[in-house]
């Protein structure tokens, strides 16, 4: 992405240098191919996790290199491409003067020669997609024995912007920690997605198995507004 002005990319044939020294996309501009990329995620991914990964890319990519209007066009084209509206995707690409040397959105150039690369997860879901866990599926997660394991505080950062420390036990599963968070913050367990070092945590994982370093911040994506918990009568 970016940094292509004045550069020559004869090996790929995607860029050439004009006599005035300006690198522009020339030749090998192929129509957008209809075939969607097939790929497998490093871990089984839910629809919600895929959406979060895409949102993270589109929120950060334009901040580094390239032109915002081109990123906006590529986002719209990617959405049309995945929705099988191939004609609209091609019209968006042509309207923004975007060149596709290989007929794919994974490598694109604008008219100034800036390079843009879209990851495959923005163009198609992985072949190992899984369904979101339902409340029924979580019923088979056994309760840990009372007062088992050792108590500690886990640092959480909610997508709402709130940081907090949650009292947990080492034998807790992720699902039981979600229930603890629900009791303190009013966020339904089914509306929480937990991430540790960028990896999604499944409900059956145990805290003691995750080996989360002390004071490490666990990210919690909340998919609904946080509700104020109802006070409990003593």
Swiss-Prot record:
Which residue windows does the record flag with biased composition (Basic and acidic residues)? 32-41
Q: Which CDD domains match?
A: Ubl_UBTD2
According to UniProt, the name of this protein is: Ubiquitin domain-containing protein 2
- SMART domains given for it? UBQ (SM00213)
Domain Ubiquitin-like positions: 152-227
* Region described as Disordered: 1-46
What does the UniProt keyword field contain?
Cytoplasm
Q: Tell me, in one coarse class, where this protein mainly resides.
A: cytoplasm
Which gene name does the record give?
Ubtd2
Q: Where is the signal peptide?
A: none
Origin, by domain of life? Answer: Eukaryota
Its GO CC terms are: cytoplasm
- According to its UniProt record, where is this protein located? Cytoplasm
Which Pfam families is this protein grouped with? Answer: UBD (PF16455), ubiquitin (PF00240)
- Polar residues composition bias: which ranges? 9-21
